[in-house]
Curated annotation (Swiss-Prot):
The lineage of its organism: Archaea, Thermoproteota, Thermoprotei, Desulfurococcales, Desulfurococcaceae. Part of the RNA polymerase complex. GO terms for biological process: DNA-templated transcription. This is DNA-directed RNA polymerase subunit Rpo10. It catalyses: RNA(n) + a ribonucleoside 5'-triphosphate = RNA(n+1) + diphosphate. Pfam families: RNA_pol_N. Keywords: Cytoplasm, DNA-directed RNA polymerase, Metal-binding, Nucleotidyltransferase, Transcription, Transferase, Zinc. Its EC number is 2.7.7.6. GO terms for cellular component: cytoplasm; DNA-directed RNA polymerase complex. Binds 1 zinc ion.
Length: 77
């Protein structure tokens, strides 16, 4: 999942806040403190940023695509 571009409920743009949010949390602030510092007041926007997880690191470990054995390909023509 990519970082959210907009709030799923109200549509407020949030994509520009994602890098700073991750940076603040990595520096030791709680997610709530980071959201307060970024000025995210609406609970729907806070939920969208707080619950977003990037899975790209996990997905990159797996190969994309399906291996089809040659004998199965002959079966289709």
């Amino acid at each position: 999942m990519l970082p959210p571009v907009r709030c799923f409920t109200c549509g407020r743009p949030l994509g520009h806040l994602w890098p700073r949010f991750r940076e603040l949390v990595a520096s030791g602030k709680t997610p709530g403190e980071a959201l307060d510092e970024l000025g995210v007041d609406r609970y729907c926007c806070r939920r969208t940023l707080f619950t977003s997880v990037t899975y790209i690191e996990h997905a990159a470990k797996y190969r994309v695509g399906i291996h089809v054995p040659p004998e199965r390909l002959k079966m289709w023509g």
